[in-house]
Amino acid sequence: MAQPHHFIRITTCKLLYGRVPKAANSSIKAALCRLLSERPPQGTKTTSDKFWQHETNNETELITLRKARKYRRSHFSFSFVRNPFDRLIAAYNNKVIEIEQPPLPMQHMGIHHDMSFESFLDVLIDTPIQRYDVHVLPQSHLLCLGRQVIPKFVGRVEQIDEHWDILRNILLREGINVMESLPQKNVRRSEKNSLKEYFHNDSLINKALQLYSDDVNLFYNDTSIDNLINNAPLPQITPLQSRSLKLSSWLQDHVFNR
């Protein structure tokens, strides 16, 4: 299977963004549009792959993880991740409950409108990862190549105001001026404690961990599963930063192999 093009490369300022659906992706894309020499016409769907690949006057392109690794020395790269339990529920609500027909890749997986959350989990468990819709792909699959974390900076959505500010200051030192705060795009579920109604027993939690334990271990290893289920405040940390692939490999080895 051809490797998906999950990274946006902005050629004019040597910037790479690793896209993670359901992790402030639309808001970050809206902010990155401000870096283009020409603003998109009003009404342009800037969340679409077509826009970033074909409608930016050759200032951007979509690239694979492997190609992003090649550009890593000459470009600054970043991404944001989300509590895996919360991201999973967001994908379920948005793609299975709120719309009449899930995206075609989900339909091909056997996912259908209004199916139960547990049945949704069972389909994910039974489906080879190569057939996953991007909205349910583990974040580690989107951002890691083998044992290497590709982005140099990985912030967390739960601390996005603080982490975006840190990222903005880093980019300013690189001569890249992004928005001070992110626009609010596609914000749907407002109940911060609504995860428990989905993960109300150990079986459901274990099924989710069977799918996304790497995401928890890599990006949320400083808190407990209970805290993630409760959407409790996270410890104040500096975002995961890795200047070299050698260091990112060390992070992977020491986190995944604990």
Describe the predicted segments one by one.
Residues 1-258:
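Membrane-interface amphipathic segments in extracytoplasmic regions
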